Amino acid sequence: MLSNRHFDFHALRSSASRPVRWLLWSTLLMICPLAGKAQSQPQIDTNPTGYALLYTGPISDPDSNEAIAAVVKQAGLPVVYLDNLDDLPARLAGARLFIIGGTEDDVEPLVHRFTPAITGALKRYLSQGGRYLGICGGAFVASLGWADEGNYVKALGLVPAESDDYDGDFSPKIHDIRWLGEVRRMYYQAGPTFALQPGTEPVRELAYFDDGRIAALMSAYGRGKVAVSGPHPEAPASWKAETQDGDTMDTNIPLAVQLVQELLSDRPVLTPR
C-alpha cells in the first residue's frame, strides 16, 4: 500500500507537472526571440529631438533670425531663442544645435561678449558632440579671426580658418555662389570668405565665390561639427527687393535645409585636411 500510494502520487505529480513544464517552455520560446530582437535593435537616443538654440540678442539681425528659424523648423527641429548670451552655458545642455545668424555690420562687439567661461562652455559642448551653425556675422564669430583697419580681431576659433570680407561693401547684393558644384544666385551682405589654416580636424569646403575663395565650409570639432557660410542660403524671396542691383535670386532655402540636416547627421566630415 505504501508503494502503491507512492507510485500513485508520483504519477499524479508527473501528470500534473506536464502542462506546467509545457507552459514554461512555451513562454521561454516566445521570450528568447524577443530578447534577440531587442539586442539587435539600435540604441534609442535618450534625447531624440532636442532643440536648436538661436541667438537673438544684441547685435543679431531679426530678419536673419526669422529666416533661419523657418529653415531649422523645416529641417525638423524646434527653435528656442536665446537673447542673453550669459545664459548660453545652461541652455546648451538640451540643444542639438547652436546658431548665430546675420548681425549688425560691426560684429566685433559680439565676439567680445563671449567671456572665457561662455567660450569654454561652447567648446566643451562641441567637443562632446554638439553642433554650431554660423551664417554671415555668425560665421565671422566662429572663425579664427580677421584683420580690421590694421588690427587683428581674435574670434572663437571654432573652424580652422581666418575670415575676411568678400567685397568690402555693406550693401546687399546677389552673387554667383558655386554651392556643392552648382552655381546658385544667392543673397549676400558683407559676409566672410575663409582662408584655411593648418589644423588636424577634417574640413569640407562646401561653396565658393566666383573668384575661387571659400564661401562656406563644414569642419569637425572633436565629436561635434561646425558649419559656416558667408552668403545667406536661408534668404527668402522677399529679400531680393533689398539688393543693390535687383538681380534675380535663386530659391536656395532647400540648400539651407540640407545644410542643417547634414550638420545634424552622424555622418563624419569626410574631406581630410
Question: Could you describe each region identified by the protein language model?
Answer:
Residues 168-239:
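Catalytic beta-strand/loop cores that center a nucleophilic Ser/Cys/Thr
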Residues 42-55, 61, 67-72:
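Mature N-terminal, pre-catalytic/accessory segment of carbohydrate-active enzymes
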Residues 44-46, 123, 231-273:
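Extracellular ligand-binding/catalytic regions of CAZymes and related secreted enzymes
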Residues 62-147:
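Helical hinge/lid and interdomain linker segments adjacent to catalytic or ligand-binding clefts
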Residues 22-33:
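Bacterial N-terminal signal peptides
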Residues 1-17:
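N-terminal secretory signal peptides that target proteins for export/translocation
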Residues 38-40:
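Boundary at the C-terminal end of the N-terminal hydrophobic targeting segment
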